Amino acid sequence: MSWIDKIFSKKPSSDSRRANVPEGVWTKCTACEQVLYRDELKRHLEVCPKCGHHMRIDARERLEYLLDKDSMTEIAADLEPKDILKFKDLKKYKDRLSAAQKDTGEKDALVAMSGTLYGMPIVAAASNFAFMGGSMGSVVGAKFVQAAEEAIEKNCPFVCFSASGGARMQEALLSLMQMAKTSAVLAKMKEKGVPFISVLTDPTLGGVSASFAMLGDLNIAEPKALIGFAGPRVIEQTVREKLPEGFQRAEFLLEHGAIDMIIQRSEMREKLASILSKLMNKPSPFLEPEIIAD
C-alpha cells in the first residue's frame, strides 16, 4: 500500500464523528432512557414518543401551544423580583435570581397571557420549573393576581398550569403571603362567576399545591404528575413507612377523588376548549353544523 493510500484509507475516529454532531440534537427520555431526536420530541410537545412520558415543558412554549396564534398579549411582563431581605444561603438570593434569569430568559417563574382559544377569549398562566423550581415568590403571586383580575374584568375563563416545588424560601414571609393573596383573588373570581381551571403538571408541591393549584372549579392533571404538599421521600423519612405504589401521582389522586380528570398534553387544547365553552355557555368549537334536509 502506498503512502497516499494509507492516508486516505484511515477511518475517522469515534471522537471526530462525535465532534461533528451539534450539541442539543439528541436527548434522553427521563423515564425509559430512550435516546430521542430533539426536534421530534419538540413536535410531540416534550412527550416521549416511545413511552408517553410527559417531560417538563417551558412555560412560554406551553402557552404558545395553548393559545391561538397572534392572539397573545403578555400580562405584567415588566414585574421583576427584588432581594428585599438581602437573603443569603449557600448563595446570595440576587445571584440565584440573576442565574435563573440568564438560564431561562424569563424574569420570574410565572408567565401570564391573555388571548383566545379557538376564538374564545381566555387568560392563561404557566409556571416555569426551570426558574428556581417554579417557586412562588412576590412576583409570581402578583402576576397570578393580575391575570385573575384581568379574567374578572373581561369575564373570561382563567387557566393556570402549575409546576412548582412550592413557596420560595429566599423570600420568607413575603412568599408565604402569596398563598393567601392568590386564594383571595380566586374567591373573588368565584363570587363573580368567572371559571378558574387549574392544570397540575409534574411536579406541583408545597405552598403552590396548598393554595391556588388545588382551588380550581375543575382540577386537571397531566399523566403521572407528582402532586402533593411534601414529596414522597420526605414523607417516608417522617412516618418511617413505605408509601403505596404510585402515591401522590395523578392517577392515585384521581382514584381517591382529589382531582377531577387527567388529560394527555396532546389533547389538552381541544379538551380545555370544549370544557370552557360549556362553562361559559358558548357553542363548542368542535360541533358540526346541523344539516337540515329540504
From Swiss-Prot:
SUPFAM superfamilies (alphabetical): ClpP/crotonase
Entries under InterPro entries matching the protein: AcCoA_carboxyl_beta, Acetyl_CoA_COase_Trfase_b_su, ClpP/crotonase-like_dom_sf, COA_CT_N, Znf-ACC
Essential cofactor(s): Zn(2+)
Catalytic activity: N(6)-carboxybiotinyl-L-lysyl-[protein] + acetyl-CoA = N(6)-biotinyl-L-lysyl-[protein] + malonyl-CoA
The UniProt record lists the keyword Nucleotide-binding: yes
Binding residue positions for Zn(2+): 29, 32, 48, 51
Segments forming C4-type zinc fingers: 29-51
Pathway: Lipid metabolism; malonyl-CoA biosynthesis; malonyl-CoA from acetyl-CoA: step 1/1
Signal peptide bounds: none
Single GO term (MF): carboxyl- or carbamoyltransferase activity
Functional note: Component of the acetyl coenzyme A carboxylase (ACC) complex. Biotin carboxylase (BC) catalyzes the carboxylation of biotin on its carrier protein (BCCP) and then the CO(2) group is transferred by the transcarboxylase to acetyl-CoA to form malonyl-CoA.
NCBIfam families hit by this protein: accD
Name under which the protein is recorded: Acetyl-coenzyme A carboxylase carboxyl transferase subunit beta
The gene coding this protein: accD
